[in-house]
Structure formats: structure tokens, C-alpha cells
Regions:
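N-terminal active-site segment of His-dependent metallophosphoesterases
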Residues: 1-58
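A short acidic-Thr-Gly-centered motif at the start of a beta-strand
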Residues: 2-9, 33-34, 58-61, 128-136, ...
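Active-site-proximal beta-strand elements of phosphoester/diester hydrolases
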Residues: 12-20, 139-146, 201-202
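Divalent metal-coordination and catalytic microenvironments
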Residues: 18, 46, 61, 71-72, ...
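Active-site neighborhood of divalent metal-dependent phosphoester bond hydrolases
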Residues: 54-129, 137, 168-174
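His/acidic metal-ligating clusters that form di-metal
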Residues: 112-192
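Conserved beta-sheet core of the metallophosphoesterase superfamily
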Residues: 160, 164-232
Length: 236
């Protein structure tokens, strides 16, 4: 469930998609939220890699004690630094944004800071289920990947919850099922948020500036209203 998040269910929750080291864009988006820095925020993971300020983004999330689920990029970094057993992905990290992350850490404390953040990553849950319901009585289910198909076996198949993509499932069929939860996730980059009856894909590729197939926008979904807040990439 919501663990030790100490959420106030009389106030909305804001779920923010994959940040990927885009610090200025994240700060600008938070400034657009009604309660700004006092907002109840949950991140879908992938705080790091590709963008220039991975270390700074993680520091910010830790400073404000915002909630976050484990993203596949955090898992790749954990494996690269041998904080978790190898699954054969360790060489993938560097070529998928890890190099930029390393540069960020070199500017901000080096291995001491890396160790601090790896310890924090190890404590991140793979999913959060929040008993704050929408108009249909659906609880909030936050994951990094498309977790809905694994909801009934989420403990047993927790790793799949992190890595799952829409294209691996019949999402139109999933959208018609009643799990009692509404799944908000990142991982699948889309030009605009995809909001269905029981899930929302909110990674709008904020780091991908110059790629016409992506919007280079950071998105947040307000729960339970499902209103979307967005910020164009504004990295300097």
C-alpha cells in the first residue's frame, strides 16, 4: 500500500513521469503545481540518465522526501555498480544514458555521492498502491512500467512491473478489465499522455529535445482528478 508516505488524502497527489536528469524542467513543472514544492509528489522512476543533471535530480527528490518507485534505469545503475546481482544488463547502462549520469556524479561528489544514491535506490519500491480513489472507486497504483497486467501477481512478478511495456500486452483488452485500481506509469515514451479507463501512461519524453517523434515535455498527473500539468524542456 502507501507504506510510510504519510499522505493526506484530503489533498491531491501528483505523479510525475520520467525526469531523466532534466533538473530545470522538473523545477519549472513543480512551480506550476497548485501547492508547488509542498505538493504530494510521486515519481514513476527513471530520475537519472540521458539528461545532464542526474545527481542533482536525485538530490532534490531526496531533499524534499518525495516518493518514487524504482525505474529500470535506477536498476541498471544498481547492477553496474554491483549493488545488486548481475542480470546481464550491466553493459547496457553506459550506452543508455549512464555516461551522462557518471559525468553528473563526477561534478557532485563522485563515488561518495554515487554510494549515497545507490543506497537510496535499493530502498525504492517497485510499486505503490494508494487507497485514495477516483470517481469510479479505483485506487491509485503507481509503477514504472505498465504494471496493470501483473497487478494480481505484483509481488511475485515485481520485476516485470518495472520493465513491462504497452507493446508487450493487449492494452486495449487490459483497459476494459476491472482490477479496482488505476495504474499510472512512465517508461513508455508518448507524445501526449495516454489516459484510459484504468491506466495512464505519462512519460512524454522530456529529455528528447530535437526528436520530432517525441514531445520533449515533462508531465504530471493530478490524482484523483487526472488533470495533466506539463512543462516543455527548459534545460540550459
Amino acid at each position: 500500500m502507501d507504506g510510510d508516505l504519510n499522505l493526506d488524502y484530503s489533498k491531491p497527489i501528483y505523479i510525475i513521469g520520467d525526469v531523466h536528469g532534466c533538473l530545470e524542467t522538473l523545477c519549472a513543472l513543480i512551480e506550476k503545481l497548485p501547492q508547488k514544492w509542498d505538493s504530494q509528489i510521486i515519481f514513476t522512476g527513471d530520475l537519472i540518465d540521458r539528461g545532464a543533471k542526474s545527481c542533482e535530480v536525485v538530490d532534490l527528490v531526496m531533499k524534499y522526501n518525495y516518493a518514487c518507485v524504482l525505474g529500470n534505469h535506477e536498476e541498471l545503475m544498481l547492477e553496474y555498480y554491483h549493488a545488486i546481482p548481475s542480470k546481464g544488463y550491466n553493459k547496457i547502462w553506459i550506452n543508455n544514458g549512464g555516461y551522462e549520469a557518471m559525468e553528473s556524479y563526477q561534478r557532485n561528489g563522485g563515488f561518495e555521492k554515487i554510494h549515497e544514491h545507490l543506497e537510496w535506490f535499493l530502498k525504492l519500491p517497485r510499486f505503490l498502491e494508494i487507497p485514495l480513489c477516483d470517481e469510479k472507486g479505483q485506487r491509485l497504483f503507481v509503477t514504472h512500467g505498465f504494471g496493470l497486467p501483473y497487478y494480481k501477481e505484483k509481488e511475485k512478478k515485481a520485476e516485470m512491473v518495472t520493465w513491462s511495456r504497452l507493446k508487450s500486452h493487449n492494452w486495449e483488452k487490459e483497459a476494459k478489465k476491472n482490477y479496482g485500481v488505476f495504474n499510472v506509469f512512465g517508461h513508455d515514451v508518448r507524445k501526449v499522455p495516454m489516459i484510459m479507463e484504468n491506466f495512464a501512461a505519462i512519460d512524454t519524453g522530456c529529455v528528447y529535445v530535437g526528436d520530432d517523434s517525441k514531445s520533449a515535455v515533462l508531465s504530471a498527473l493530478e490524482w484523483p482528478s487526472k488533470q495533466i500539468y506539463q512543462q516543455d524542456n527548459c534545460e540550459r
